[in-house]
Amino acid sequence: MSWRGRSTYYWPRPRRYVQPPEVIGPMRPEQFSDEVEPATPEEGEPATQRQDPAAAQEGEDEGASAGQGPKPEADSQEQGHPQTGCECEDGPDGQEVDPPNPEEVKTPEEGEKQSQC
């Protein structure tokens, strides 16, 4: 008796043909510009000045936040994470640190204890 299982070899899938950008046509720089051109008003409509919405919002925020007092700074972020004395997973800048190379690690002396997380 011989075992006839499913083959692990799969035929390569046919690739879909995609036209390269040269064949589609040249790119038009006006489609990719960062600045948006303002729409020209029609003859019957008067031209209105458009303000940047972010600039208008800043003016409103200044008046509202003036009477509220100062906001807490980075100290409040540290209070959310109490120190446990074991900071193996995070480095000083909050990013993960790779474990040290075992060849470079010094073995602790008999009288010293090594903290373990």
UniProtKB/Swiss-Prot annotation:
One Pfam family recorded for the sequence: GAGE
UniProt region (Disordered), positions on chain: 1-117
Further remark: This gene belongs to a family of genes organized in clustered repeats. They have a high degree of predicted sequence identity, but differ by scattered single nucleotide substitution. Their sequences contain either the antigenic peptide YYWPRPRRY or YRPRPRRY which is recognized by cytotoxic T-cells.
Bias (Basic and acidic residues): 103-117
InterPro entries: GAGE, GAGE_fam
Protein known as: G antigen 6
Start-end of Acidic residues biased regions: 32-45, 87-96
Transmembrane regions listed in the UniProt entry: none
Reported tissue expression: Expressed in a variety of tumor tissues but not in normal tissues, except testis.
Taxonomic source organism: Homo sapiens (Human)
Similarity-based family: Belongs to the GAGE family.
